[in-house]
């Protein structure tokens, strides 16, 4: 459920596959879900390289992953694949948080991975000129401050003190934005941001995943709609 919620909003994804074990059943499921919800680009990280003694085995795993991506209509031949080990990179960074490029081969692999992400996954144009819309993913209650709704801004911009409507599942209600946070406090959030919106006068029980926060008057609830549904089985 959480994978689907997140994937539906991604500009791209890093697919992590164990170089020691190869693709697992959930690997196939995640690739299929990524395709179903429209994730446009994937970069592959072959983890646990330190546990693979034979380079040919790692090459076989890479080939298997590329074939799997091809099967689900991703361009398996051109997708970047970076081998490495997340654990040893993390241990090196814990030992020395200021580790720079060229100082540790496993940390360098993470830098290489992020270079591939930057070069292969383009930054899409954001719809900042349209009315504000955010799909609620989670709701938190912060003592002394109020209710925070988190999610991805689908379009538009939002500033502190703006009025918004909370729409869906329950009667539409209005609220005032008293704070915006994305790793740090913001004055404004724009399309593409994953943000926490602090709302005045709204109880945690009044808002839940599946609702949207929107510019007043721009979104209305509907009782009928057409949808394409993909059913998962256990």
UniProtKB/Swiss-Prot annotation:
Q: What is its EC number?
A: 3.6.5.3
* Coiled-coil region: none
- Residues binding GTP: 47-50
Under which main EC class is this enzyme filed?
hydrolase
Question: Among its keywords, does the record have Transport?
Answer: no
Keyword tags: Chloroplast, Elongation factor, GTP-binding, Hydrolase, Nucleotide-binding, Plastid, Protein biosynthesis
Residue ranges of domain tr-type G in the record: 1-125
Q: Subcellular localization, per the record?
A: Plastid, Chloroplast
The GO cellular component terms are:
chloroplast; mitochondrion
Query: In which broad location class does this protein mainly occur, judging by the first location in its UniProt entry?
Result: plastid
Domain of life of the organism encoding this protein: Eukaryota
Biological role stated in the UniProt entry: GTP hydrolase that promotes the GTP-dependent binding of aminoacyl-tRNA to the A-site of ribosomes during protein biosynthesis.
* Record-given protein name: Elongation factor Tu, chloroplastic
Please tell me the species this chain comes from: Pandorina morum (Freshwater green alga)
Q: Quick one: which gene encodes this?
A: tufA
